[in-house]
């Protein structure tokens, strides 16, 4: 009987493991007081469904909101923590800072908030809506979902000057490492999270310096010659700097690992991306993430949970905004 019972327990464990593997990535939240999986289970049980439906509707109208919301969450967390301060509008707020001027998807977050206030007034924070929406955009672009710890409250301060430390398109690996490390993220988190560039675009004005004038040369020598000619056609030297180019050439709207493969071929659009391949500190990680049995999806989920717990406001601090674009 003991043997039979042990076998039954083993089978039960394996069944649970299979469900976990084929469902969503099992990323667990870090030790942050106040955030947990299912925070709104009793106070607003349909919270995640309402957010998901709002994101689905926004994506159906304009698929560009997927990389926009993902980037918005990243920028929110990197400036005084994941407190929804990126969502506040007005003069000299984070939204007006240079790196944030082209962010898309604010209307999706506002729509979700309106519906949540109707269903559960004063319960769900804008910071949590943004964290949940970022996860949902990955799913919509054929990525793998994960469990998002919730329970954040909203910050009351949003200053454009605080956005100066956001990672930039010309940053070296060393500079990127410094910026990530300052927030408790390591080099692997850096390479994994930047893999979010598998969806989205960049304006020609952001990287055109690589195409025509880099350190006295005609172009950045790390760019594949064929790709260089392609980029120069898309982004002429005196052309419109607002023209958008896929960050993951050939697969710019699908969540996959081709972004890393492009780096290995000298086809990274941003300088800060391409150096992940040329720098020996990060190249081995890129090689692992582009491998046939890549763990990118699982690792991205884990790093997103780590990032989403940066500097969160919980407990009696902060507030639950009535509208995401303004403090109460």
Curated annotation (Swiss-Prot):
It is found in: Secreted. Glycans are attached at residues 213, 262. GO terms for cellular component: apoplast; plant-type cell wall; secretory vesicle. Pfam families: peroxidase. GO terms for biological process: defense response to fungus; hydrogen peroxide catabolic process; lignin metabolic process; respiratory burst; response to oxidative stress; rhythmic process. GO terms for molecular function: heme binding; lactoperoxidase activity; metal ion binding; peroxidase activity. Ca(2+) 1 binds at residues 76, 79, 81, 83, 85. Keywords: Biological rhythms, Calcium, Disulfide bond, Glycoprotein, Heme, Hydrogen peroxide, Iron, Metal-binding, Oxidoreductase, Peroxidase, Secreted, Signal. The record marks 71 as: Transition state stabilizer. Ca(2+) 2 binds at residues 198, 248, 251, 256. InterPro entries: Haem_peroxidase (IPR002016), Haem_peroxidase_sf (IPR010255), Peroxidase_pln (IPR000823), Peroxidases_AS (IPR019794), Peroxidases_heam-ligand_BS (IPR019793), Secretory_peroxidase (IPR033905). Induction: Induced in response of mechanical wounding. Induced by methyl jasmonate, a plant defense-related signaling molecule. Expressed under a diurnal rhythm (circadian clock control). It catalyses: 2 a phenolic donor + H2O2 = 2 a phenolic radical donor + 2 H2O. The active site is at residue 75. It is an enzyme of class 1 (oxidoreductase). Heme b binds at residue 197. Removal of H(2)O(2), oxidation of toxic reductants, biosynthesis and degradation of lignin, suberization, auxin catabolism, response to environmental stresses such as wounding, pathogen attack and oxidative stress. These functions might be dependent on each isozyme/isoform in each plant tissue. This is Peroxidase 71. It comes from Arabidopsis thaliana (Mouse-ear cress).
């Amino acid at each position: 009987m003991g043997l039979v019972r042990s076998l039954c327990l083993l089978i039960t464990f394996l069944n649970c493991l299979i469900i976990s593997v084929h469902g969503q990535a099992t990323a667990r939240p870090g030790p942050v007081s106040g955030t947990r999986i299912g925070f709104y289970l009793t106070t607003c049980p349909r919270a995640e469904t309402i957010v998901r439906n709002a994101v689905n509707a926004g994506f159906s109208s304009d698929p560009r909101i997927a990389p926009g919301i993902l980037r918005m969450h990243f920028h929110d967390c990197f400036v005084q923590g994941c407190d929804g301060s990126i969502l506040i509008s007005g003069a000299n707020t984070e939204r007006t800072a240079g790196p944030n001027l082209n962010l898309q998807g604010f209307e999706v977050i506002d729509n979700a908030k309106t519906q949540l206030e109707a269903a559960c007034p004063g319960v769900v924070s804008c910071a949590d809506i943004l964290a949940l929406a970022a996860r949902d955009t990955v799913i919509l672009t054929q990525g793998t979902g994960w469990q998002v710890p919730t329970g954040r409250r909203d910050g009351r301060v949003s200053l454009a000057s605080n956005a100066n430390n956001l990672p930039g398109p010309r940053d070296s690996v060393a500079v990127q490492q410094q910026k990530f490390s300052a927030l408790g993220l390591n080099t692997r988190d850096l390479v994994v999270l930047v893999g979010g560039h598998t969806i989205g675009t960049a304006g020609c004005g952001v990287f055109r310096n690589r195409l025509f004038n880099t350190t006295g040369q005609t172009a950045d020598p790390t760019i594949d010659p064929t790709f260089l000619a392609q980029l120069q056609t898309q982004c002429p030297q005196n052309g419109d700097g607002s023209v958008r180019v896929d960050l993951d050439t050939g697969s710019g709207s699908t969540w996959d690992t081709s972004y890393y493969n492009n780096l290995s071929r000298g086809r990274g659009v941003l300088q800060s991306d391409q150096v992940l391949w040329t720098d020996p500190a990060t190249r081995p990680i890129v090689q692992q993430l582009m491998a046939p049995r890549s763990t990118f999806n699982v690792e991205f989920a884990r790093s997103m949970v780590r990032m989403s717990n940066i500097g969160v406001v919980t407990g009696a601090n902060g507030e639950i905004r009535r509208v995401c674009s303004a403090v109460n």
